[in-house]
Amino acid sequence: MQFQEKEFLPVILGADITAYSLARSFHEEYGIKSLVLSMSEGGYIANSDIIENRIFPGLENKDVLVKHLIEVGKEFEGKKKLIVLGCGDWYVRALIESKKELSPYYIIPY
């Protein structure tokens, strides 16, 4: 499978069908691979070639989520624009509440 190199990278929170759907949409439109942050290896995103899944236990805790998002943000700082999307109300709420801490690293469309 051929992937395009773009100036942005979708960072998707969660491992459900919505995460897969978002990753697939980005892949179909831009030919890119999405980065998914999840708490598990299985589910709809397992073995997908269009997703890089990074597993972080404890993402249901907002402080843990923000910590890992900042780590990932620093990893790509100056290399790619990161667009973070939450799959589920809880993730979206956490992103909105943490916008100040995360906005140096991410585009947060909420």
PLM features: residue spans?
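ATP-binding N-terminal substructure of ATP-dependent carboxylate-amine bond-forming enzymes
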Residues: 1-110
